[in-house]
Amino acid sequence: MSAADKVKPAASPASEDPSAIAGNISYHAQYSPHFSPLAFGPEQAFYATAESVRDHLLQRWNDTYLHFHKTDPKQTYYLSMEYLQGRALTNAVGNLAITGAYADALKKFGYELEAIAGQERDAALGNGGLGRLASCFLDSMATLNLPSWGYGLRYRYGLFKQRIAKEGQEEIAEDWLDKFSPWEIVRHDVVYPIRFFGHVEISPDGKRKWAGGEVLNALAYDVPIPGYKTKNAISLRLWDATATAEDFNLFQFNDGQYESAAQLHSRAQQICAVLYPGDATEEGKLLRLKQQYFLCSASLQDIIFRFKERKADRVSGKWSEFPSKVAVQMNDTHPTLAIPELMRLLMDVEGLGWDEAWAVTNKTVAYTNHTVLPEALEKWSQAVMKKLLPRHMEIIEEIDKRFREMVISTRKDMEGKIESMRVLDNNPEKPVVRMANLCVVAGHTVNGVAELHSNILKQELFADYVSIWPNKFQNKTNGITPRRWLRFCNPELSEIVTKWLKTDQWTSNLDLLTGLRKFADDEKLHAEWAAAKLASKKRLAKHVLDVTGVTIDPDSLFDIQIKRIHEYKRQLMNILGAVYRYKKLKEMSAADRQKVTPRTVMVGGKAFATYTNAKRIVKLVNDVGAVVNNDADVNKYLKVVFIPNYNVSVAEVLIPGSELSQHISTAGMEASGTSNMKFSLNGCVIIGTLDGANVEIREEVGQDNFFLFGAKADQVAGLRKDRENGLFKPDPRFEEAKQFIRSGAFGTYDYTPLLDSLEGNTGFGRGDYFLVGYDFPSYIDAQARVDEAYKDKKKWVKMSILNTAGSGKFSSDRTIDQYAKEIWGISACPVP
């Protein structure tokens, strides 16, 4: 049966009446057909519904663009290699305050809104916290009516879809664009040329210009981002790489040279095929650098076009106005090439001199650092940079030269430190460009993302720069959008919060959550809170059964760790703890087991395809689960489940149903973390180290409502030194857990290389760099405290309430408001 058979088609793009909305959905099913109009199944219903919602978005989006154009405010442009958007339908109707109307409209077709929203595939534009943060930030920018846009790349296959097979993790291409995305608007009128390779030409008057090589096109796709209960909708502009018809060699094709004929088209497709392509080979390194430059060049050409477009009388002499109209925020080091590219565009295209171009660039760009991990502080081979971007390499060399001269002339006391501070590392064995150093030297502001992290940046990583530019460094503790991460993903708890606070204003003013504290001992609130949590746990148990086939008990303690698999995040410690728990359960009598707190341990996250030890950890979690879950003696008291293909939509089911969440990174190594904030906001108690935002979460929720363990950040270097000197004495429980795995209790797979990373005192891949062994005993003791606390239901529910009540600080609205005032210098520009 078609949609038209159920509801008469009628275009009503702006109506909020359920009957008119139903007519508009039917209209899209009939007249924007991507499927046969003769059928209207759940998938067809999703696409027609999404296009109907897009009608609402487009009106706001156009009004916002025209308003910004007319008022010409200073605007922020957020450059990020990743955006982890999640599903858009529920978020869009929620932010537009038309959820009820769309639910009623879909009932006229016999569908539930939740079921139709479940048809949507997550946009595969990101991997982990970096991309999800960028998406939360866009939501807050729109909600705060800030003149701001996001820029990213339109990846065809994303990072990968994770499948768990007998051998462990398998990576397969994401299929989110197999049909199409109903949210994006292709902009055939927004196309910019992007050059690679070539050479630098010098004209008779000494001016330098990049020429030759190959030129591709950047084509814009716009995704409207609606604010919550506001008329503003901003843009996430995604770039796709294309080649022109002229680049197709018809003569070669007709001569049977099919691949040669379409070489440039093939190379264009590679650029936006995959997020973070493997970079072990020269080709992989070139492709990653191409991606980064492609994003920066297209975005800056677009920004400059808009700067000129908004004031047609601007001429070259007015480029000093540029920083008063444009703020560029680099999300990590991936967009660092924005610095030399802006310099190139200003000098080679617009005709500015070095000093003027440098002044404009320095006042325009700012850098957010997200890591202190050495391997994540990008360094690019000078040879690769020179080959792909010869003009940019010249500009980087000049920046490096002038920085050295500045330090030598103004800070004689720092001459001995210049080599480590330089943008270029000219080590003859491996000369590289240090991208983080380039960001610090060229940007007007550098910020960390949690108080502890920002202090480490100032006191350790960038300490020498601080003595030159003490005011350049700031902290901006990360945040999350309370719309997606409580209001929409946890409706039961949201209703309770609104009822007890007597307002739903907390959705855009999260500080109001502190009002729950005075009810923390109220028995009525306890009963409602526990019922909401149980409903979320049952929903989670159904998801686990659907995707893994494992039945879990909603009355057990749900213990969850979901994040990118990495040794510093220490999923290995989690699974060693589960192994130790299993061994102790096996040794107990049946009577003693009945006194144990039943627990379901869930782990989820993707391991990079080339990160062998991370993939071994995924395999180990699955192997332990296969044994534990099928052991009739203990599986009433312990289950271990790996949740496959972790993404935003999965998180929206896991987080509301969580009771204990593990954030157990080696202290000083997690810049912030944001999933900890999401769990805490949803009334989940955290077990964790004093790392990243954990420090501030513990301060806000109260130290009695956080299970702390492990070394502190300022102890870590000394503990590693002790290990090197053979002074570490392992706890017997740690040895017992490792030996149990080595015994073959969990199958025949050889875990020796993984376990050997925890052994010895020195050597590559040895010496327990992440201090799993040192922290293990205090981790096990903290888990024992968790078991005891969970037995006291009243105490546990109170802890849960106080976690939610203490989460107000961690709204991305607060974070973005601080960026706007203290880094970007922009103000709200609401559509009237």
From Swiss-Prot:
Catalytically driven reaction(s): [(1->4)-alpha-D-glucosyl](n) + phosphate = [(1->4)-alpha-D-glucosyl](n-1) + alpha-D-glucose 1-phosphate
Protein's UniProt keywords contain Ribonucleoprotein: no
Gene Ontology biological process terms in this record: glycogen catabolic process
GO terms for cellular component: cytoplasm
GO molecular function annotations of the record: glycogen phosphorylase activity; pyridoxal phosphate binding
Keywords for the protein's UniProt record, in alphabetical order: Allosteric enzyme, Carbohydrate metabolism, Cytoplasm, Glycosyltransferase, Pyridoxal phosphate, Transferase
Cofactor requirement: pyridoxal 5'-phosphate
Keyword Transferase: yes
Family indicated by similarity: Belongs to the glycogen phosphorylase family.
Record-linked CDD domains: GT35_Glycogen_Phosphorylase
Task performed by this protein: Phosphorylase is an important allosteric enzyme in carbohydrate metabolism. Enzymes from different sources differ in their regulatory mechanisms and in their natural substrates. However, all known phosphorylases share catalytic and structural properties.
Record EC number: 2.4.1.1
Location, primary (coarse class): cytoplasm
Record-given protein name: Alpha-glucan phosphorylase, H isozyme
Species in which this protein is naturally found: Triticum aestivum (Wheat)
Disulfide bonding pattern of the chain: none
Entry's localization field: Cytoplasm
Post-translational modification N6-(pyridoxal phosphate)lysine, affected residues: K678
Matches recorded under Pfam families: Phosphorylase (PF00343)
